[in-house]
Amino acid sequence: MPVKNLFDLAGEVALVTGASSGLGARFARVLAGHGAKVVCVARRRDRLEALVASIAAEGGTAMAAEADVTAPASMAAAFDAAQQKFGTVTILVNNAGIARQARLLEQTDAMWREVMDANLNAVYSVAQMGAQRMVAANVPGSIVNIASILGFGVSKSLSAYAVAKAGVVQLTRAMALELAGRQIRVNAIAPGYFVTEINADFLATEKGAAMAREIPMRRFGAEGDLDGALLLLASKAGAFITGASLVVDGGQILGLRGG
């Protein structure tokens, strides 16, 4: 295959969770921009519809599917809607997640369960659902789970998040081992700190600037910095890659506790 065609996603159907904003919205745009039909999944329908309109204006093809990743029935409905409109999902980007900060001694059981449900249990459930449908349709596929550098190290006040993301890393490896024979690749992307609409104001403060200076490349991740990693793992360019966790963090993990 010519090198120029390695990242071509024409004929693929991609489903992206947490697509209403931030990294998820960017992932949806990138996949659509390279030819995939994209199913944008999140809870905020108004944001999803705006994203779909934006993708269409750029020449891409997308649909909105309102769903909660922690509610299996609603995710099954999203997969059904994707199947009906575009066909079997062949690229799954498990991006949805939450972060809750609390020191260990003050953290509540409810907070722990909330973080685990959104960041680990839902990743397992959605990935299993996607894989089952790929196998039933007898098609190859790619599952990309969004982990974090905190899956490899730790940070104060984020114990639940770090444990969940470490679980995503191991889940990715376990799924890759079991699904390789079905021609389904499973990989993870582990981002460092990225600027999003949620944290942009804080990261622009002096405290945020001090945090950036601790990163070897002296900046936070910006829009577009994950494009290459996503396309590599989703496309034919990564046809022989499975079970990997690709760290994209400007070297931040090098100074992380336990990293």
Task: Describe each PLM feature range.
Residues 2-5, 153, 231, 242-259:
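Short C-terminal tail/terminal secondary-structure segment
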Residues 13, 20-21:
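Conserved glycine-rich cofactor-binding loop
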Residues 34-50:
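Conserved glycine-rich Rossmann-like NAD(P)H-binding loop of the short-chain dehydrogenase/reductase
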Residues 103-104, 111-116, 199, 211:
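Substrate-binding pocket helix/loop in short-chain dehydrogenase/reductase
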Residues 127, 164, 172:
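Active-site helix of classical SDR
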Residues 132, 177-181, 239:
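Alpha-helical segment proximal to the catalytic Tyr-Lys
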Residues 148:
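Residue(s) in the substrate-gating loop at a strand-loop-helix junction
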